[in-house]
Amino acid sequence: MNTTTSEMNPANILLVKAHSMGIGDLLRSSAAWSALKARWPDTRLHLLMLSKQSGYATEAFIRSHHLLASAHFVTVKTGDPGQDRQPSRPRAQVWAEVAQRLKDQPIDLIIDCESGGMRTALLTWWLGRIKRAQRVGIAQFPMRRLCYDLVAPSGPRYAARLGLPLPIDYTERDFVALAALGIARNGTRITLKSAAAGQAWRNDHPLLAGAGQSIVVLNIGCGTEDAIPKRPELPKLVACLVALYAQQPFALHLSGAEFEREVNQAFRGLLSTAMAQHGWQAEVLDWAGQLSLDELTGLLGQADLVVSSDSGPYHMAVALGVPTLCWFNFDTPPSYHPQRGVVALVLPGPDQFVASALGLLTAGCQT
């Protein structure tokens, strides 16, 4: 196909991804979705995600994203998530399922957002043939460029061209493929709006605070075994929040999954003891395990400040435009959101934490 980017006006774009089903990993693609909608306001965006297993909570959450017309999740592995080895499904079986999911969906442009391997490259090439669609992808190595009609430079070349450090910021990664279309990020933020469930929860559960108090949502998170190293040490976190309360009293709401309820309760006990030493008693409500991801947007969206570890609710709060302070246990530049209304701190002490939190509270919402 010889259509140039200036002549393009695709009615339906398919975005192919196969990296991770984590909340933050998928939500950070929303900046690229925004950029595509800015270029072609009337285009309909469709996500095709090749995931390792089915049933992730993020499936329903991403399907409800306001920038997507549809989202399709196709598993590429067999067996249970806990197995040491999970065999891959035969390629023909995966492709047949993809074709079935998309059989009634017109597609004009297919963008392979992945840079590694050949799985998504070959699938994009094949889908382009059966849908008679333009194909866009990343020439991470020479063989991949043969699968596309329009080719973006490799990730390292893209980074060098823009003077970006490696590894590339996670939000920036989808823009590597978009470079083939002449679409640049230009500071585009990730974005999220509460879907119907989130709006309903917010209407049914208005968060209240006393006179002169702020509403703070704390997500300690990192409850899975692989994420525990990212969880803040509870005594240090308590010390920072007590120091903040001394400067700006707040009502505190704890978020988290059901399996994070135990750590929330441990934190709550430590905080209560520390506050009592000053004669204070903060209101603390624990919502762990009680909210869907869509309902969680109704909680986060009411906060004056969200404090979170490096986990999904951190990216959700940023995307909602809520002032957000993220606590990192180690320097992780690809996970930062270098923009107004967001502060990333690495092992902060009370003084640094309080100064950053007060700055965010003063600046207010970024939507």
Locate each region found by the language model.
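Catalytic machinery of carbohydrate-active enzymes
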Residues: 1-367
